[in-house]
Amino acid sequence: MTDAATNPLLLESTLPYGLPDYRQIRPEHYLPAFEAAFAEHRREIENITRVRSMPTFENTMVALEQSGDLLGRVARTFYTVSSADATAQIQEIDEALAPLMAAHQDAVQLDGQLYGRIRTLHDRLADLALDPEQRYLVERHYREMTHAGAGLDDTQKERLTELNQRLSVLTTTFEKNLLADTNDLAVVFDDAAELDGLTEGELSAAAQNAADRGLNGKYVVTLTLFTGHPYLSSLTDRESRRRLLEASRSRGARGNEYDNRAVLREIVRLRAERASLLGYDSHAAYVTSDETAGSPEAVHALLRRLAVPAARNARAEQEALQRIVDAEAEPFALEAHDWAFYTEKVRAAEYDLDRTALRPWFEAERVLQDGVFRAATALYGITFTEREDLPAYHPDARVFEVHNADGSPQGLFILDLYTRDTKRGGAWMNSIVSQSRLRGTLPIVVNNLNVPKPAAGQPTLLTLDEVTTLFHEFGHALHGLFATVTYPHFAGTAVFRDFVEFPSQVNEMWILWPEVLAAYARHRETGEPLPQEVVDKLHASEAFNQGFATSEYLAASWIDQAWHALDAHAAAEVTDVAAFEAAALADIGLDNPAVPTRYSSTYFAHVFSGGYSAGYYSYIWSEVLDADTVEWFRENGGLTRENGDRFRERLLGVGGSKDPLEAYRDFRGRDADIAPLLTRRGLDA
């Protein structure tokens, strides 16, 4: 235990914007801080429910929004670290915390007295003199508590609490297993010749990975979150490609202590039982009922509509790849581990474009400063100043202060670029502090990526995919930074799951925008800009390989939907995870063995340990809005302050304070049109 008077998590930070002083925080501070924060939040809720007077917006909704400040501060501080630097000690805390957090959340969300007060306000909405944000706050809290089960009887609530606590343990276990198995499956190569095709920097990084593991003289390639590893596009040795892909696909399914198959089957079964308890046919029905999609049927209709042309295009792409293979001295039947490598050969033949050779033009610092930041300055007038005096949670994480054009402060942005064994896979954005006029706070947002760290003294050269990820995650960061809401419940990215990817996807449009690209895509040695003919080829090849890209994404989305369409009885009958996946993919026609799903279930962190259960469709759902918005920018002059201000004020700034599709109509002037998405992905032919 630590003394509350000296626990830095229980003291107001004296740093700018309320940034936690990570220099003072030790692992042993976290659990005592959570215990104190849980207790304080319970007292705050009791103070609301003990009020004897009639519920008013002030004594119920405002009081509720002001509650939980300490808990939110402690939780955001901890979960930032547990995702990005999960040492063994942090993982132990995470496991111990999971059931405690679930129990506390249930105690609040299922509080009958609190629910009764909010329901009274909801029933009287027509008689209350509230502004639109206040009305929507009442509606959302009522909807969310109902959705969580606040209207159930005591026996049902008891079972619901048991389910939620068990699920919190299982999802934490899934993530812990995945991190451990991913590290365990890093592929060891004895000879540099096996890694022919990698750049000098990539080879040096592999040698350093081996040295870090006590394997001097060898080479270690660590796995990424996706099934397909970026190195598959450049490794010339077919056996090396096969080993890398097989290692990736075996995660969580090897019969060892990190096997996730039983874990995920129990997750599916308990989610289905919970959905039934709450009055829904399936977990997918439960989730989508409170999203813009509205129902699983709407999701399935979109996925099936896209799957047919995507699979057709993938087959055509496969035939083109096979022709390249057949022309070689020793032809063979193309397999999944060959796709990316021969895709680059076809790209080179058809477009005279070698994407792997572009990295010298994408030096990370230049991409950040002259690309990501420069585009944001042009659109929104904001500027960025690095604050090396402010501590982040890890030495690799960098802190930037953000100001508006008039000099007013907007918040802090933290970038944590590099991969490490203690960081979970993928890329993400999270908030350490959320904006709120009520609380007088400005945001602190974090972007995490998993770019391999180069050897000491070497530059960080990005792939085009990594450049895309950087722009994408910064789109989320802008959503968090630009929040202009009164109530913390609505801050930044606190929007429907199938809407949240929309702003981040829109930010990707500036990657190849002429004045942005010309500023950041410069050769690291000569300073020469990326040649115009290469830029033209990048544009010409934008729809290239989209059959594969769309199919592998849709396959993962469909697996997610298939699991979460099951009722509890059907879920209990599934014993073979691989067979279930295969049947699901055959059902939608995405069972081409040369096009593996982006994630298999045993390492599908988004849906079994993240917030995307029954919601992985959100990326393509949001992309309908994104593609339509990109058309709007192009029609209205592109990268201008006027356009940026409109997007900021009508979409990014409102956060979750109004219905997202209403906000979209306010920005666009109409509902989104699917045609731009179909054209972008080559699905309209």
Model-derived features with residue positions:
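Short His/Asp/Glu-rich catalytic/ion-coordination signatures at enzyme active sites or charged loops
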Residues: 14-29, 78-97, 120-162, 222-262, ...
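Intrinsically disordered or highly flexible coil/loop and linker segments, enriched in small
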Residues: 39, 43, 47-54, 70-87, ...
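Active-site-proximal, well-structured secondary-structure segments within enzyme catalytic domains
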Residues: 133, 137-139, 166-169, 176, ...
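Short, hydrophobic/amphipathic alpha-helical patches that form generic packing surfaces
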Residues: 69-80, 139, 143, 339-347, ...
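Short, hydrophobic/aliphatic alpha-helical segments
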Residues: 260-272, 444-447, 485, 654-656
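N-terminal helix-rich structural modules
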Residues: 1-199, 633
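Short pre-active-site segment immediately N-terminal to the catalytic Zn-binding motif
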Residues: 452-471
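C-terminal, non-catalytic "cap/extension" segments appended to globular domains
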Residues: 2-32, 36, 218-220, 349-351, ...
